[in-house]
């Protein structure tokens, strides 16, 4: 990430603390990798993601209120959490640019977004399975322990990096975790899209808008595996900014879908 002075490091620290020094807090522009162009693009990307995430959470909350009694509450709550946590991630990214705050655990927050998206995709399939598959409920009960393990991975990454810094082991766990979470979500997405009985339904349409968000959001924390492999961290951060923009773009189309769905309720 960046040093307290705002200069991007070429290799990840292995033992330095992750949250920076509160005593040296300053408000002002802090360049990423001493690169004004990268800093500007990153700032725009984070502001864009924050604005879209707030809107996404807003429409998820409205859909939840409009769907009371329909059995879709958990799905809308998952999507509301996606928007809320993505907003936190984006705002932290903005603060890293306009203040001396250094939240090296930031990508761990996006890892939580990836997990929430995967669980939302699972919930889409779960809701459809209850209406088309009598065995759907019992199948999902056996997955709770696995999902709790996923939550534990997110906690280890966020709090581990916050306390210990960008250790290679934690970056590896973050990257692998993102890929595993995405695989979990895409497993249910594939099963959903292959089910002829639910094709063309609201749930099917929503799923097809969520999968691109899941794919692009996964790449942001997953690309840190390149850091572990020895790629210059400045290059990795350039890639992460690109993937943040792609995530925001995909989330915007999903937000439009939530707004359209609200009009049909």
Positions of predicted regions on the chain:
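Helix-loop junctions on the outward
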Residues: 24-31, 65-68, 88-106, 223-235
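Membrane-helix boundary elements
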Residues: 25-40, 152-175
């Amino acid at each position: 990430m960046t040093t307290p002075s705002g200069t991007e490091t070429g290799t990840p620290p292995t033992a330095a603390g992750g949250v920076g020094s509160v005593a040296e807090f300053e408000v002002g522009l802090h360049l990423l990798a001493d690169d004004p162009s990268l800093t500007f693009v990153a700032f725009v990307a984070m502001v864009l993601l924050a604005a879209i995430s707030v809107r996404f959470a807003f429409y998820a909350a409205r859909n939840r209120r409009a769907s009371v009694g329909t059995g879709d509450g958990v799905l809308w709550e998952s999507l509301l959490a996606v928007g809320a946590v993505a907003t936190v991630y984006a705002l932290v990214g903005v603060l890293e640019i306009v203040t001396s705050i250094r939240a090296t655990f930031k990508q761990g927050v996006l890892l939580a977004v990836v997990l929430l998206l995967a669980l939302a995709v699972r919930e889409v399939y779960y809701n459809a399975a209850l209406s088309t598959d009598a065995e759907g409920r019992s199948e999902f009960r056996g997955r709770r322990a696995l999902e709790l393990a996923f939550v534990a991975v997110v906690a280890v990454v966020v709090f581990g990096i916050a306390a210990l810094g960008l250790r290679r082991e934690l970056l590896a766990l973050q990257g692998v975790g993102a890929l595993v979470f995405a695989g979990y979500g895409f497993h249910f997405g594939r099963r959903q899209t292959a089910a002829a009985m639910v094709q063309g339904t609201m749930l099917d349409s929503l799923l097809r808008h969520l999968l691109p968000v899941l794919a692009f959001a996964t790449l942001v924390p997953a690309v840190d595996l390149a850091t572990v492999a020895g790629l210059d961290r400045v290059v990795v951060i350039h890639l992460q900014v690109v993937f943040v923009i792609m995530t925001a773009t995909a989330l915007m189309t999903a937000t439009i879908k939530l707004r359209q769905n609200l009009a049909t309720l």
